[in-house]
Amino acid sequence: LTFSVTAILFFAAAVLVFLDTFFAFGAGQRLPFFSLTSADLAGFILPVFFVLGGVWALFCAMGYAAGKPQQMGSFGAGFGMTIGMFLFCIKRFVASPTSILRIMPTLDILSALAVLLLCCAMLRAVYLPRGASEEKHLFLFGLLAFLFGTCFTGAKLAYLAVTGSLSLTAGADLPLVGLGLVGLAVALHAVHTDRRRPARYT
């Protein structure tokens, strides 16, 4: 279910970000390459990776529903999703440098970083043999992604919607909310798997 929701949020984000950039470009606005609060030229690139992320989430949803392992054919979409999250993270670093006095931009950057770490951990767990400490990494990165991606970003989007300041640019945050939910599911599954593993004595 979480992968299905994430796929929908990825596709919605791709449409919203592209429309925001297209309308701003069509209106003759001078667009920077990276911007945090307005349209930018990266809005023509990010939607491609968001679509790949949605496709990968759909593959995962169908695979888990059928009880089958993921095929290597879906690795390209997952890799594209990770590249997109990396680009999104770089965008936030460049467009909003961190400082102690700028708490919200710092939390935005931490949200992107947490989700990027989760994407890397999930790719390794899905397509490579799992090591003994794999569940610990999935648990840690999953909870971090849920805390920053779903709890913080979701609350921020809700606040923007209530105050009437929500814009199409904020659509780029939707994948963070979805991947945070996936992170929570991954963390809970990692705990369940680790408990079923027999104890090791030295």
Predicted regions and their residues:
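Transmembrane alpha-helical segments of multi-pass membrane proteins
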Residues: L1-A13, M72-L87, K136-F148
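Short helix-loop boundary/capping segments
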Residues: F75-M122
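C-terminal transmembrane-bundle signature of multipass membrane proteins
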Residues: P105-T202
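Juxtamembrane "helix-exit" motif on the non-cytosolic side of transmembrane helices
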Residues: V15-L31, C89-I100, T153-G164
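Hydrophobic, membrane-facing alpha-helical anchors
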Residues: Q29-F34, F49-Q70, L87-R92
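Alpha-helical transmembrane segments of polytopic membrane proteins
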Residues: T2-T6, L36-V55, M104-L116, L168-G180
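Membrane-interface helix-boundary motifs at transmembrane edges
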Residues: L1, M62-F75, V126-K136
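N-terminal topogenic module of multi-pass integral membrane proteins
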Residues: L1-I45
